[in-house]
């Protein structure tokens, strides 16, 4: 048996799952290594492609985003009912976990050591996804869990709870993985001087550990400030007030910088009328901050996503789309402008669309590798009535839409099965 299959089956047994995985190379004899020079869509069973590409193209992916089935049991365009009848440790969730395990395993193999994966999920399978990810990627490589508001009023009435959020679970391939950070919020910069827009970020007097005068004696010195303008300088001058880094309890502390640094960067300091010295934080178009774990933006809401789908396709051909701005924000925070991005539950193709928009905005060269099923669409679904016969037809239609609107966007289609 193939080594990958052995590893997956070992993981499955350790988790207490009932599945047994087999690797069939016959289906992949015509599969070429990953072409990272263009965007691509692989049509068919994503597991087949993942297991092949993890062999031919390991460590090629910079970032992976997926929006897998949530196992809701709802009748939507794709199969979303993998509730088991077994009575093992995971009960109803066994089949869903067994479905995702090999796919996540191969995605892990495809990621670079610096790679990152982000997965959308809701309450029903969050805990079980976390177990899978901890096992495959390692608990130490858990980066964070982002709570994403998906609607204003929420949905459902179970026990008088209206769920208005879902999650974005983020892991790195190794300790070398690092988020790009989210763009700073320019609206927070409420002051301006000749050097640009700025905000007051924190006191210039050191707090906490190693903040005493005795810790760094050379960082205890007087500053001189103008109470009318807030300007601060190191040299004394007639009419200026003097301030030392002494706190409200009379404890002698120290400044953040040496006297020489404060002299060179005095333009970055600001004093209040009562002599509290602060550091100015200037705005920059390239500035990044740590990714926050709560995202509440109306442009991320499901309603916005549905409106976008309706505008592009003429009707709601996909039941569970993600908003374009939401996927753009994920990619922008977690991947570099030249990233190769994998989405093996491509759905309505939003990931490719988001990457194309970002490239047009910042001159990036992001490429997307998509995978989507060629499963037939039921005749009663609105997508069938709109002319689509397979789920992948919707994805390809979105890619054509992107190509029509972004001339630099090109893609190729791979279907070997």
From Swiss-Prot:
One of its GO terms (biological process) is methylation. Its EC number is 2.1.1.72. It catalyses: a 2'-deoxyadenosine in DNA + S-adenosyl-L-methionine = an N(6)-methyl-2'-deoxyadenosine in DNA + S-adenosyl-L-homocysteine + H(+). It comes from the Bacteria. It holds the Pfam family N6_N4_Mtase. PROSITE patterns: N6_MTASE. The keyword Hydrolase does not apply. SUPFAM superfamilies: S-adenosyl-L-methionine-dependent methyltransferases. Keywords: Methyltransferase, Restriction system, S-adenosyl-L-methionine, Transferase. The keyword Phosphoprotein does not apply. One of its GO terms (molecular function) is site-specific DNA-methyltransferase (adenine-specific) activity. Belongs to the N(4)/N(6)-methyltransferase family. This is Type II methyltransferase M.KpnI.
């Amino acid at each position: 048996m193939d080594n990958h299959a052995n590893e997956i089956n070992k993981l499955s047994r350790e988790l207490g799952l009932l599945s047994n995985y087999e690797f069939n190379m016959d289906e992949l004899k015509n599969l070429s290594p990953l072409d990272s020079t263009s965007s691509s869509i692989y049509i068919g069973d994503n597991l087949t492609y993942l297991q092949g590409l993890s062999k031919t193209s390991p460590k090629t992916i910079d970032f992976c985003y997926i929006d897998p089935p949530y196992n809701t049991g709802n009748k939507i365009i794709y199969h979303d009912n993998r509730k088991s009848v077994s009575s093992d440790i995971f009960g109803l969730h066994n089949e869903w976990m067994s479905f995702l395990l090999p796919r996540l395993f191969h995605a892990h193999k495809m990621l670079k050591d610096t790679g990152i994966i982000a997965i959308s999920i809701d309450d029903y399978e969050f805990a079980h996804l976390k177990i899978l990810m901890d096992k495959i990627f390692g608990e130490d490589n858990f980066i964070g869990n982002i709570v994403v508001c998906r609607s204003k009023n929420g949905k459902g009435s179970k026990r008088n709870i209206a769920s208005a959020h879902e999650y974005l679970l983020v892991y790195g391939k190794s300790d070398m993985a690092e988020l790009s950070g989210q763009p700073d919020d320019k609206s927070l910069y409420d002051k301006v001087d000749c050097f640009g827009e700025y905000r007051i970020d924190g006191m210039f007097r050191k707090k906490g550990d190693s903040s005493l005068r005795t810790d760094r004696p050379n960082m205890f010195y007087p500053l001189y400030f103008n109470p009318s303008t807030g300007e601060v300088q190191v040299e004394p001058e007639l009419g200026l007030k003097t301030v030392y880094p002494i706190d409200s309890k009379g404890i002698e502390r120290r400044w953040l910088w040496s006297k020489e640094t404060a002299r060179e960067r005095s333009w970055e300091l600001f004093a209040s009328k009562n002599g509290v010295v602060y550091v100015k934080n200037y705005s920059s178009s390239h500035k990044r901050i740590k990714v926050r774990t709560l995202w509440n933006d109306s442009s991320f809401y499901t309603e916005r996503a549905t409106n976008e789908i309706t505008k592009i396709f003429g009707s709601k051909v996909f039941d569970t789309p993600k908003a374009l701005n939401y996927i753009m924000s994920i990619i922008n925070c977690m991947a570099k402008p030249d990233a190769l991005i994998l989405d093996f539950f491509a759905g309505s193709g939003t990931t490719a669309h988001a990457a194309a928009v970002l490239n047009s905005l910042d001159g990036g060269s992001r490429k997307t590798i998509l995978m989507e099923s060629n499963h037939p669409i039921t005749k009663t679904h609105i997508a069938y009535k709109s002319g689509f016969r397979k789920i992948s037809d919707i994805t390809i239609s979105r890619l054509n839409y992107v190509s029509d609107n972004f001339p630099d966007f090109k893609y190729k289609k791979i279907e070997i099965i």
